[in-house]
């Protein structure tokens, strides 16, 4: 952790750097919140492959888009953003929570100990209390691919996650400049952040899931002029209905449209990652109906 402090001191010399160890400018949403930056370029890309027992035999049937989305939903409404959450003490890979099946009870208790005034700047490296963006996705992937605790994890630099996962043969990688559409389940990596696409609305806004201050939440991209979009409306509607306490504390659902132009993409290969219910063809409305109704 001494290296973290040194990194912070150096970063003060830049105009907008946060304690990310490599001086990157933060990605902000329309509220001024900062997406996860703890998983910076300095983080080790601990890109492990699924264990043998999850690559062969009956267990393969459990590795599916349905399971991935089910896991992605579980921390919603009760998991706060913590810089370094999901990482280990050495800050070079997955921590205990990110290689454990099911949500950590500590995430919910920490949420209950806090209120609308929660500020993630005050809880940096309380790694057991919540999740940052790559810790969140690493936990989701672990719970999708693995069937017991304590195996090698999937937490790594958020910036590299889409490309690294595609490199495992899990899907197709597309550079940010070439991305033209956003389907359910797409893993999207931008500088200092990673998020999960949940499909494209009629107005071309994109619904998404990510861990970004104040926590794990549904969001939508704004319109070009910064106005509210259909995706933002859906994120608010379903959060308010299903997580009213969260909505009462943190009623923020919009992210800048540049999420779309700045993010590379990994689209799951449905030949090896089952999509029996055709989630990739669903609209955000259809998906949310499946997830919550």
Q: Can you annotate each of these PLM segments?
A:
Residues 1-20:
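Sec-dependent bacterial lipoprotein signal peptides
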Residues 19-35:
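Sec-dependent signal peptide cleavage junction
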Residues 49-146, 267-293:
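N-terminal capping segments
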Residues 82-101, 204-231:
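Internal, charge-rich low-complexity segments
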Residues 147-226:
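...with weaker cross-activation on analogous glycine-rich loops/strands in unrelated enzymes
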Residues 224-293:
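Low-complexity, Gly/Ser/Thr/Pro-rich intrinsically disordered linker/tail segments
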């Amino acid at each position: 952790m001494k290296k973290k402090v040194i990194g912070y001191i150096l970063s003060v010399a830049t105009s907008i750097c946060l304690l990310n160890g490599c001086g990157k400018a933060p990605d902000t949403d329309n509220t001024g919140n900062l997406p996860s930056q703890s998983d910076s370029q300095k983080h080790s890309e601990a890109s492990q492959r699924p264990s043998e027992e999850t690559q062969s035999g009956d267990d393969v049937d459990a590795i599916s888009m349905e399971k991935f989305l089910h896991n992605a939903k579980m921390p919603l409404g009760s998991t706060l953003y913590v810089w370094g959450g999901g990482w280990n003490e050495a800050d070079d890979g997955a921590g205990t929570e990110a290689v454990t099946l099911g949500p950590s009870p500590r995430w919910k208790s920490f949420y209950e100990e806090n209120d609308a005034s929660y500020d993630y700047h005050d809880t940096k490296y309380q790694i057991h209390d919540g999740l940052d963006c790559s810790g969140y996705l690493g936990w989701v992937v672990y719970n999708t691919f693995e069937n017991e605790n304590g195996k090698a994890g999937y937490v790594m630099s958020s910036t590299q996650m889409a490309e690294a996962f595609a490199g495992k043969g899990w899907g197709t990688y597309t550079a940010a400049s070439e991305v033209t559409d956003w389907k359910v389940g797409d893993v999207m990596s931008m500088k200092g952040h990673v998020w999960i696409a949940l499909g494209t609305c009629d107005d071309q806004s994109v619904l998404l899931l990510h861990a970004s201050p104040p926590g794990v939440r549904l969001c939508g991209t704004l319109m070009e002029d910064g106005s509210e979009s259909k995706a933002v409306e859906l994120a608010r509607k379903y959060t308010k209905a299903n997580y009213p306490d969260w909505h009462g504390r943190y009623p923020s659902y919009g992210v800048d449209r540049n999420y779309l132009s700045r993010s590379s993409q990994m689209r799951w290969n449905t030949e090896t990652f089952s999509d029996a219910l055709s989630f990739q063809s669903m609209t955000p409305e259809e998906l949310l109906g499946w997830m919550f109704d």
